Amino acid sequence: MRIVDSARLWFAEGNSDKVYEVDLVEVATDQYVVNFRYGRRGTALRDGTKTANPVSLAKARAVFESLVQEKRAGGYRDGNATVTPTPLAGDPYRTGPVVAAVPLEVQHIVRRLNQGRRRQPTIPYDVRRAETLGHVAAEPALLELLRGCAATDTAFAAQLIPALAHCGTSRSLSNLASYVVSPQLGTLARCASMMIAQRVGGSADTYARCVAPLLAAVQPSLDDDNSTAVIAIATSVMSQALTVGLYLSGHAAARPAVIAVVRTAGPGDQHIVHVLYKLAGLQRDGEMFAICARHIDDQRSTKDNRSAQRYFRRRTVRTLRRLGNAASRDFAPMACAMLLAYRDSDAEPVRHGVFGETWPAFARYHALNYLLHDNKDDLFRGAHDTSAWHQGGQGLSRIELDDAAFPALWKQRPDLLWRLVCGGQLHAAIDFAALTLRSNTGFLASITDDELADTMTDGHRTAQKFAFEFAMQRAMSPTLARGAAASNHSPAHDWVVAWAAQHPSDVAASGTWLALLITGN
């Protein structure tokens, strides 16, 4: 059997979104048939034939062309054409081009999604990729797949709902409404609905339907902006529904309570942390994602939680890698939040294996090693399940910029690199950020003297050294002198004293300078 020719047609008008496919097939030597398939986009298509018995090529070609022309005359368009569907009067969902100006990769993904699960075995990958890219052009195909999803197929629906959270418009809200009450998918549907509503409008109605029912126990305290009371209630109840409601509410008094729940969660409350971790990953909330990931990572490993703990370690890296591969603008904020969550005190004793390998101090922190050392030649990921990293017997070389995962994406966000320098508590992470920033002279010039002084005063020792390096390149000012005098970096003290010795008249004329020299470290 050989397909000689085929046509992929589709029709979109108002709420109608249909597909019609025609194939001219050679079933034997000089014997041909014309088959067709039709149905709503994304669903299993019905099939049929226009030739009950095989015919000659000339006759089959005539039947094929006639059927294609008939469908085109009825409003069908070629499947690879750029089409602006005609909206129905008053239709709020069809307000402009659906396929126009869509990136080529998104067009390929949409085409595969439109073929449905029966004809496209890579659908789960395409759904995840659509979620990562977050383009609205994928919404119609995702909705069709969701409508055709069996009530018992919660696993596939759990992939489609996050994709709609990033690709959906107001059209998706009505389709997600039925999932809000689902025991298995309700939390995902609530989160997706809130994300869409915040993006396209209608947050008040969606909040009342999806979030408010979960907050009855703390609503008076939220109304009073009493974060202390909210924390007390949330940590005493330790309810998944309440914690999810607080997180989705976005209320200023709610977030400290959610963080407190994560930090105080015991072995019996880990399901709450796992749910928050997934919601934070869906919303690309770097801070909460990192807090939950580190909490899971820091739990004492037992036979009951070891498998889940290792799974979440791998999932953290998988989330970051997908964002990086898509060149997503969310990669750098998520990665920065993860690196800010590690400290020098997280180091563990160095271990040596029987085959000469060395497990360094931060070997078990999969996300940390992935972000800083993914492209490093002398550091390797160990077994898949444990995800620990080890090095050869030659010792670990100094960190280089190209060793990190997606260095080009880091270079696009010097503000986050500077944040990592100022707020980081891990030498390796700060060293990486400083190395990346050194070549960005334009951004470094925009850093104020106050910021440099604060970093020299309160930053990590590595950050103080980096800030002092650039402070030296500037004209001395009382602000820089204040930071250098309070720094733990000895050369900074020497710099201030040497400048004062060379400019005694300036020091004598300024009470600020005298105070700095008297009170400085």
Task: Walk through the language-model features, giving the residues of each.
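Short N-terminal "domain-start" leader segments
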Residues: 1-32
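A short, charged, amphipathic alpha-helix used as a generic interaction element across diverse proteins
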Residues: 55-72, 431
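Structural detector for internal amphipathic alpha-helices that build alpha-solenoid repeat scaffolds
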Residues: 121-134, 144-147, 155-169, 178, ...
